[in-house]
Amino acid sequence: MAGARLRLAAWRVPGCAWPGRPPAWQSYPVTSVQPADPAAKPPPPHVRIVQLPGPVFRALADGDLAAANALSPVSLPAYFASPEWAGTWRMRSEQVEQDPASAAWVTGVIWDEQQQVAVGRAGYHGPPDPSGMVEIGYAVDPEYRRRGYARAALEALLARAAREPQVRTVRVSISPDNTASFDLASQYGFAEVGEQWDDEDGLEIIYEVDAGRYQSSRSSRPD
């Protein structure tokens, strides 16, 4: 029990005994040691989205990590040049070649500011369309999953959308069996508005949220 004191019995040495209370140095404070809470969560990661120049997209699509890192503003790990992400990089490379201005919007690097490491990719599918809609996408390197990076990336994308005056609506398309992504998106007010067929991913459910909702919810949180 915190604050309790442990009192030692007086030594009984022939010819030497302490009557009454023992000397002060014989009383020791007892402090309780609280075990670490296994359920305690680490603080959320702090990330930013780092945009990539067009040639980096092409190098990653070709699986050339060395060439990509020679041009990238941040260091990229091997998974970025893996076959799993090659299709995304190829699509973005072609998109930026046709519309160089889209490079400021499309897929970038999820960069952990504290760890100084690239943990995934995130961005918009392109600039806002005439109605003010942007569609977001994000994916985390398997080595860094289940650490809060998907949430951090989603919040970074929503925060930028809220700041951009031409953006009115944020969209995300999720496969019906991707419950983890649905659960995360639903926490930020995304509501189902339809469905679509993607040639690569198959059936997807379309969810949208007002771009200003995230900024409003942040400003209403207590300090």
Predicted regions and their residues:
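Conserved beta-strand-loop-alpha-helix junction that forms the acyl-donor binding cleft
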Residues: 172-182
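Proline- and acidic/polar-enriched loop/turn elements at helix boundaries
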Residues: 156, 173-174, 197
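Conserved G/P- and acidic residue-centered "switch" motifs that form tight phosphate/ATP-binding loops
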Residues: 116, 148, 178
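Conserved acetyl-CoA-binding loop-helix of GNAT-fold acetyltransferases
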Residues: 138-140, 146-160, 183-187
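Extreme N-terminal basic, low-complexity initiation segments
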Residues: 2-8
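GNAT-family acyltransferases
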Residues: 8-12, 16-135, 160, 164, ...
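Conserved GNAT acetyl-CoA-binding A-motif
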Residues: 164-173
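A short, internal acetyl-CoA/4′-phosphopantetheine-binding micro-motif in the GNAT/acyltransferase core
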Residues: 111, 137-146, 174-175
